[in-house]
A protein has these predicted regions:
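Well-ordered beta-strand positions
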Residues: 137-138, 239-240, 337, 388-389, ...
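Beta->alpha turn/N-cap motifs
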Residues: 145, 243-245, 504-506
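Active-site-proximal helix/loop microenvironment
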Residues: 221-242, 479-503
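Intrinsically disordered, low-complexity segments enriched in small/flexible residues
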Residues: 3, 7, 18-53, 59-70, ...
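Conserved catalytic cores of soluble enzyme domains
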Residues: 89-226, 342-482, 486-487, 514
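Short acidic, glycine-rich surface-loop motifs adjacent to enzyme active sites
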Residues: 77, 81-93, 331-346
Length: 599
């Protein structure tokens, strides 16, 4: 990618100061580095999680450090004759529920081959506590940790009464009776429709979560925590209390070898830490270069917008960058099939439509499949419908086909404080001031403007239905039955034709190889980081920027992003970020009406 290399050159003076000397991964006490043909325990270090996208902040992560890299590492480990066992380290975190379900299924394949799978966690979450029940033959919990497996619940915060006290008027509309996005601003509790949809989706997700535990006692305990380590052992959630070194020793004992190879995570063998070359390599996309026929995975994670920026943006999916990625893949002779990995609550309908359009063009040239992580909701599902086939995990959320939009009117509250405003329209026609300032927080909507906004939303909703119908090859009437803004679990979506198969990223890659007619052991590249970095920094492709410009842009971006995001509790950030298009001048969003995260 031409400008990706220029970006690396421009950033060189800046990042040389933060480069580190290349160091070998430290060996655990009792571990040895394996020779080429020696039997070994392969280790998965999940202490830093498994990010879906390459951009784990301002700099791109190596492709091997993404969730796709984790799936590939397991695929290779399963095929290797030298694998004698598996060690999984969680630390205090690990995986979200959709990832945990797929990785657990992959690890059971090692167990079926008679290979030990030893897992260690400093602390367990809902997702990892269920994971270890299914995936691990031996389960360790840190003596000072805890098992925070407490069951699943959703919390929605309602602000209607507070806004009333502050004299802030809420002008929000929605299309779809289940599209409850504005409800927290308009009501003090959920509508019957919102309660019905959320109860049904949570119940289905809960069923998939509990199904990870095969033993009845452990399954029951998943909803009874939090537990101290001794109580977690008593309830059958873990086998032993101990440190990571104890789990390492047990893995070596069961595998009958002291050789260990870290195949995933920040401690990957021979790749401990970043040096300057690795950062430049990642920025330029160099590690993804291969002329051999292969499958490309395109991670699309986060809120959807037309471009990077906005007060609450945390990166996410931008049509500005993603369209370039998809067009490049369409023209690549080496890329024989594409898997789009989606985890998004939605966002801009315009950006969603632009990406959908490129996927539809791409699938005319080569197979395009979608793999859903935590969710493909609203705008996320809009994009997913552009793929020929959609895979989703049992806990994935899909659907939410609907739109909402509006604004908060601050003028009554400001008037109470002695602040007044007056709009001077250029035209003196009746209603000109209301029309010209229809997105202003100082001008309330009149009936005519509200009617026009409602018509605008209905048009976007109708287009949303038509796009899903075209992409999924369904009648629009059938899509409407599952629309109205309602969310669905993946099993519910399968029954309704919204997805094609319950399965994870690995199944999607296998299918893509088959459809693309590439070998089963062919490479898998992870695409998408280099295209967006200059856009993120507000430096266009044609800018002649020097190191000073880039350094200033880096500082500007981080300061703006950090200040805004620090105002929002972490669990609400995905939803708030999906509203970024409203702050960028769009009147309507296609977004999940609340933050939905299962840990």
């Amino acid at each position: 990618v031409g400008f990706g290399r220029r970006a690396a050159a421009l950033l060189l003076p800046f990042i040389v100061a933060c480069s580190t000397r290349h160091r070998a991964a430290p060996s655990e006490e009792g571990s040895t580095r394996p020779s080429k043909h020696e039997q070994r325990v392969i280790e998965l270090d999940l202490t830093a999680g498994a990010p879906e996208a390459l951009s784990g902040g301002l700099f791109a992560l190596p492709a091997t450090r993404t969730y796709t890299g984790l799936v590939r590492a397991l695929e290779k480990g399963l095929a290797a004759d030298t694998t004698a066992g598996v060690l999984v380290r969680f630390g205090e975190g690990g995986l979200d529920l959709a990832q945990a379900q797929e990785v657990a299924d992959l690890l059971t394949r090692f167990s079926k081959k008679g290979l030990p799978v030893v897992c260690h966690a400093d602390g367990l979450t809902n997702a990892t506590a269920a994971f270890v029940q299914r995936a691990c033959t031996r389960r360790y919990l840190g003596p000072a940790g805890e098992a925070e497996t407490v069951g699943l619940a959703a919390q929605v915060v309602y602000l209607h009464s507070l806004l009333d006290r502050l004299k802030i008027e809420v002008d929000f509309l929605h299309v779809g009776k289940f599209k409850s996005g504005p409800e927290p601003l308009l009501q003090d509790g959920p509508s019957p429709e919102a309660r019905e949809a959320l109860d049904a989706a949570l119940g289905s997700v809960r069923d998939g979560w509990l199904a990870l535990a095969s033993k009845p006692d452990a399954r029951a305990a998943l909803e009874l925590g939090p537990f101290s380590p001794p109580d977690a052992k008593t309830h059958g959630l873990v086998d032993e209390l101990g440190y990571a070194s104890d789990a390492v020793a047990e893995a070596h004992r069961l595998a009958k070898t002291t050789a260990t190879e870290v195949v995933y995570g920040p401690r990957t063998s021979g790749k401990h830490g970043f040096d300057l070359g690795e950062i430049v390599h990642a920025l330029t996309g160099g590690e993804n270069e291969t002329s051999s026929p292969h499958v490309a995975v395109v991670p699309m994670q986060g809120a959807i917008s037309t471009s990077a920026g906005g007060p609450f943006s945390s990166g996410g999916i931008t049509s500005q960058a993603m369209v370039k990625v998809l067009q490049r893949l369409a023209h690549s002779d080496a890329v024989k099939a594409v898997v789009v990995r989606i985890d998004s609550p939605g966002g801009s309908p315009l950006a969603s439509d632009l990406i959908w359009h490129e996927l539809m063009n791409l699938r005319k040239k080569k197979p395009v499949l979608a793999s859903v992580g935590g969710m493909a909701a609203s705008g996320g599902f809009y994009i997913a419908s552009g793929a020929q086939k959609i895979y989703a995990e049992p806990s994935s959320i899909v659907g939410s086909i609907g739109v909402f939009g509006g604004k908060l009117v601050l003028s009554p509250g400001l008037k109470e404080l002695g602040v007044s405003s007056f709009t001077f329209p250029a035209s003196h026609a009746e209603g000109a001031a209301e029309r010209a300032g229809y997105l202003s927080p100082l001008v309330p909507w009149n009936d005519e403007t509200r009617g026009r906004v409602r018509a605008l939303m209905q048009g976007i909703y109708d287009l949303f239905i038509a796009r899903v119908a075209e992409g999924r090859k369904m009648a629009a009437e059938k899509v409407l039955v599952s629309a109205e803004g309602r969310i669905w679990s993946a099993p519910q979506g399968l029954e309704r034709g919204l997805i094609d198969q319950i399965g994870g990223l690995q199944e999607a890659i296998v299918e893509a190889r088959t459809l693309g007619k590439v070998p089963v052991d062919s490479a898998v590249t992870v695409e998408g980081a280099a295209e967006g970095i200059l856009d993120m920094l507000n430096l266009g492709d044609d800018d002649e920027a020097d190191a000073a410009h880039v350094s200033a842009a880096l500082a500007r971006y981080e300061a703006r992003r950090t200040i805004a995001l620090d105002l929002i509790p972490e669990e609400f950030r995905p939803f708030v970020a999906s509203l970024t298009p409203l702050f960028q001048g769009e009147a309507v969003v296609a977004a999940l009406p609340y933050a939905f995260t299962v840990r």
